[in-house]
Each structure stands twice: as C-alpha cells, then as structure tokens.
C-alpha cells in the first residue's frame, strides 16, 4: 500500500468517527446552534490585558464570551487546555471538569476535535507561564468539523493545495491571513485617499460591446437576449473619460479587469485595478499623487516608509527617480553597445533589436521596436521606485503627445523591483488625433496584432464634445499588495487565483 493510500485510509477512518459524533449531536437536537454571541475578539483581549498583572487580573474577574476554531488541545486529567483561533488571533481556554455543569466535560468537551468551532463563556486569568487564558464556565459546540485540519496542523505547505483550497490555507497559515489583511488595507487606504482629495467613486461596465482602454486580448462572451457578442472589460478607461467629458472632473474606480493572456507569478487573467482621472492636471501631477499615495499606504500599513520586498528595500519617503524610456535604454544598454542614435532611426533600431535576439514583427514601427529593446535591456534594472517617462506615441494610442517632441507622449510607467506597478499619462483630448490613432490600431490588428486596440467610435464622438485637459492613471492592486505584503507571487495575494483544471 502506498503512502498516499495509507493517508487516505486514515482520513476516511477519522472522518467516520467524526460523522458518528455528529450523528450523536443530531440525536440530541440542534447540531448547529446559532444563538451564541461573542463579545470579544482574541487580539483585542491580548492588547488590553497581556500586560496586566496576573493577581490584579484575577481580582477584576473579567467575564468574556469568545468563539473560534480549535487549533490545539492538551488534556491533563480533569482539565484541558485548548487554543482557539478567531479572525483576529488565538487565545487559550482552560476547560476544567469542576468548573462546568455535571457531565459536560466528559460528554461534550470530550468529543471535541481539532477544527471544531466552539463558543465559551468564562473569566480571564494568567497561567503560571503568564499566558492570558479564559477559565471557562459555559461551553457550546457550534460547528462539528467532519474533516481534520491539514497534517494535524503542522502547517499547509503544498502550494497547489494552498491556492485551490484557500480556506485551508487561511486556517493554517498566519502569514497568509496577514497577506490578505494587508491587501484589504491597501484597497481601503486607496479609497480613503481619493475620497479625501475630492474624487468620486464610480462603477463602469464590466460587459462591453467594444473592449477598449488597453492593448490586450479580451475574453469573449455572448448575450443571448440581445444576440450580440460582448467582451469582459480589459480596462475602464474610455468610460471614465466619458464621465470627465460629462462634468465629473475627478473620478476613480476600484474594480476587476480581465485579460485573456498567460498566467505567471505576475499575471492573473482576472485582476484588480485602480483607475482615476483628474481634470486640469497633467502627468507630472499624477506622479506626485502616486508618490504621496504609496508613502501614505506604507506608513498606514507598515508604520514606516521603508518597504522590504524579497532582497530589496525601498524608501517611499524619498522622491522616486524619473527617467525617459530612451535614456533608460541607453543607460542600461550601454554594455550591449546601444547608443542614442540606435533609437531614433528605424533601420538602426531594427538592426539593434535583431542583434539582441528580438523577433521584430512586421507591424512594428520605430516606437514598438524601441520599446522592445527597452524591455530586453533595461526594464529589469528599474529596481528602486522609478517613473519611466516619454513613451513612443506608437505604443501609447490614448496618451497626449509631448509639446516639444510629438514622437513621444506625456506618459509614465511606475516600476518597483523591476516590475511595472502603474501606468499614467496626460490624456489625449484631440478628437481628430484620437481618431487617427484608432485607425492605426485597426490597421495593426488587421496585420496580425491581436492585442491592438479596437476602435470605439462613440468615444471619439465624446471627445468631439470636449474633454478638458485631463490626466489619468491605472495602478495594479494585486502588485501593490505583493509589494506591501512581501509576497513573491500574484497568486499569494489573490484569494482564489486562476488554476489549471486537474
């Protein structure tokens, strides 16, 4: 018999015993009661009483009602020490036969298993080892767990199981719970920041007839009643800018985007984005906003402007570096013989790209080639927080052209740890220029670029009504959560990530 078969046999045997216990509970009446009400969380009790002297705590005779999942139990004759875990932390229970009604210790507490959810009433005291504990006087089994905790609660280490059965991961791993608490604080902090700045939170369509706002491959679905193909949105940008045209001059949205692309440690097909738009601002204002926001999040979540990620350490209290895409490519490509002149001539850029092993697509112009060279030689060097600016107009179809050099745009991308975190720009509000750029995207799509943008005629009409000078930015919530939680994979910060079917 294999080791796996032995484990399955043991599991089946343990589950059979637990089901028999549940059957006995059903025979007594309601096996899943719902009238117990706790009045305290474990962490709140620790915060308030861990530093309290044991004798003083005993004299105060503080009565509490707590509830949670049994994580450990240690029987000592007529008493049992039990550790329960609630949403905040863990706390120890002292359950003694003499402190409970007759028969309860043997008939009820004696049948409890690891993983069961219980509610108790009792008074706080300190053990000889100075551990805050609840001396129980009333107990109630609230939920009988039919399956045991993972590996007798030695921890859930199988990554595949952690992602597929996140509930087990959250029960077993304190670090995972901390990660998702941080993620929640990131979202709450962003919302608080923008509301405090006078922005209005809005919701725009997730199902779109024309997917726009980004260069990506969309998911396609079909609306039966309307008999029309629709797309899960790849970005909310064009709808948000319509709102600015309509007079909502400061808007933001925190919501899902969907892109039918690969899955990796940095990519999930369903992900969360912040997008915001501010009238009478430019991309410099947005870079300032971003620095301020990330600094605020670090202080609120971590208590410091120092953010540690893997082997790196970032100080969000310092100004972020700002460098153009062309300058970064020359700076980090110098050891590969790249000079400035290679990036301003099509033939030289194409030859440079091919020398680097880049497969140049027929539909690419100079801007796309230069961007590919940047990604090859420079992107991974942008470790410290860096705003990469002045992207080629060819790869920035929605961004405003730069006044001094119309071949590039007033655009930036934020890189931290060699990864893109955000993307923003002064918005293109010239309807005729936008129409021409959409046409160029259509031509690229017809030439085989399946990530080129669709043309949105109605958006052009909206621009013809007049979009005030505006700047907008998108920030990846998942990647921000990875950063603040020091999580190596995007799957570690998404509760239920996309997984290949078994």
Curated annotation (Swiss-Prot):
GO biological process, one term: lysyl-tRNA aminoacylation
Pfam families: tRNA-synt_2, tRNA_anti-codon
Keywords, sorted A to Z: Aminoacyl-tRNA synthetase, ATP-binding, Cytoplasm, Ligase, Magnesium, Metal-binding, Nucleotide-binding, Protein biosynthesis
Binding site for Mg(2+) 2: 420
Chief localization: cytoplasm
Subcellular location, record wording: Cytoplasm
Requisite cofactors: Mg(2+)
Any one of the GO CC terms: cytosol
Enzyme Commission no: 6.1.1.6
Note on how the cofactor is bound: Binds 3 Mg(2+) ions per subunit.
Known catalytic reactions: tRNA(Lys) + L-lysine + ATP = L-lysyl-tRNA(Lys) + AMP + diphosphate
Subunit: Homodimer.
Entry's family note: Belongs to the class-II aminoacyl-tRNA synthetase family.
UniProt-recorded name of the protein: Lysine--tRNA ligase
Organism of provenance: Haemophilus influenzae (strain 86-028NP)
């Amino acid at each position: 018999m294999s080791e796996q078969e032995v484990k399955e046999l043991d599991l089946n045997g343990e589950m059979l015993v637990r089901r028999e216990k549940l059957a006995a509970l059903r025979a007594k009446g309601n096996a899943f009661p719902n009238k117990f009400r706790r009045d305290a969380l474990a962490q709140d009790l620790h915060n308030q009483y861990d530093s309290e002297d044991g004798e003083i705590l005993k004299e105060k005779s503080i009565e509490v009602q707590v509830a949670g999942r049994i994580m450990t139990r240690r029987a000592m004759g007529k008493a049992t020490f039990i550790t329960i875990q609630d949403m905040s932390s863990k706390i120890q229970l002292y359950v003694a036969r003499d402190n409970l009604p007759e028969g309860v210790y043997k008939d009820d507490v004696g049948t409890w298993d690891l993983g069961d959810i219980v509610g108790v009433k009792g008074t706080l005291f300190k053990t000889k080892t100075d551990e805050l504990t609840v001396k129980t006087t009333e107990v109630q089994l609230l939920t009988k767990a039919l399956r045991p905790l993972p590996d007798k609660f030695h921890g859930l280490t199988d990554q595949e199981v952690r992602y597929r059965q996140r509930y087990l991961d959250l029960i077993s791993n304190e670090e995972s719970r901390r990660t998702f608490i941080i993620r929640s604080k990131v979202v709450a902090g962003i919302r608080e920041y923008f509301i405090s700045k006078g922005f209005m939170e809005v919701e725009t369509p997730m199902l779109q007839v024309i997917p726009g706002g980004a260069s990506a491959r969309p998911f396609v679905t079909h609306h039966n009643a309307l008999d029309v193909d629709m797309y899960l949105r790849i970005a909310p940008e064009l709808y948000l800018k319509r709102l600015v045209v309509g007079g909502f001059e400061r808007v933001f949205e925190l919501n899902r985007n969907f892109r039918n692309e690969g899955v990796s440690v940095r990519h999930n097909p369903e992900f969360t984005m912040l997008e915001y738009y501010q009238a009478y601002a430019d991309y410099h204002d947005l870079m300032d906003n971003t620095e301020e926001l990330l600094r605020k999040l670090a202080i609120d979540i971590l208590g410091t402007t120092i953010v540690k990620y893997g082997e790196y350490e970032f100080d969000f209290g310092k100004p972020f570096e700002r460098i153009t895409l062309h300058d970064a490519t020359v700076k980090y490509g110098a050891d590969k013989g790249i000079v400035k002149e290679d990036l301003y001539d099509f033939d030289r850029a194409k030859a440079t790209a091919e020398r680097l092993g880049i497969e140049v697509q027929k539909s690419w112009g100079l801007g796309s080639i230069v961007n590919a060279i940047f990604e090859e030689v420079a992107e991974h060097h942008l470790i410290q927080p860096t705003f990469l600016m002045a992207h080629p107009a060819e790869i920035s179809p929605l961004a405003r052209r730069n006044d001094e050099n119309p071949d590039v745009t007033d655009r930036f991308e934020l890189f931290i740890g060699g990864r893109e975190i955000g993307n923003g720009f002064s918005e293109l509000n010239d309807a005729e220029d936008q129409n021409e750029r959409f046409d160029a995207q259509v031509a690229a799509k017809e030439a085989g670029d399946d990530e080129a943008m669709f043309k949105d005629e109605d958006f052009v009409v909206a621009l013809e009504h007049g979009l005030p000078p505006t700047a907008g930015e998108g920030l990846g919530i998942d990647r921000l959560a990875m950063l603040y939680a020091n999580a190596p994979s995007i799957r570690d910060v998404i509760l239920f990530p996309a997984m290949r079917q078994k």
